[in-house]
Design a protein with these regions (language model features):
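Sec-dependent N-terminal signal peptides
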Residues: 4-13
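Glycine/tyrosine- and acidic-biased, solvent-exposed loop/turn segments at the edges of beta-strands
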Residues: 14-117
Length: 117
């Protein structure tokens, strides 16, 4: 009997935790839809905009579980374009995109101004 009670209470705890998850937030602004997605811990995961056809447009930013930026860049009608930035523990990469293809990469680390070009 104790085993069934413990199993039931564990299931209820998991169900309550799942209900605490933040649902994505969408806001319509004219022809664009702003979107905010969340990690399981409630921190923002991604922010950006879609057009009415569902294509990614404008700036998109991604964050880790602690709220630190992982990447930021620009989409034109669903295609990566221009400069994108990717952060990791000790490096920053600047990646130039044209039609979603990488055309240049510059990498910085904590010890030098430009590590790779």
């Amino acid at each position: 009997m104790k085993i069934y009670l413990i199993a039931a209470l564990s299931f209820i705890g998991v169900t309550v935790s799942a209900q605490d998850l933040k649902s994505p937030l969408f806001q319509v602004d004219g022809e664009l839809i702003s979107a905010t997605y969340y990690h399981e811990n409630g921190e923002v995961s991604q922010k950006g905009t879609f057009n009415k056809d569902g294509a990614l447009v404008g700036f998109w930013t991604s964050y880790d579980n602690n709220g630190n930026k992982l990447s930021q860049g620009y989409y034109e009608n669903g295609i990566k374009s221009g400069k994108w930035f990717f952060w990791s523990e000790d490096t920053l990469k600047e990646v130039d995109f044209q039609d979603s293809k990488i055309i240049n990469v510059i990498e910085w680390d904590e010890k030098s101004e430009v590590a790779l070009k």
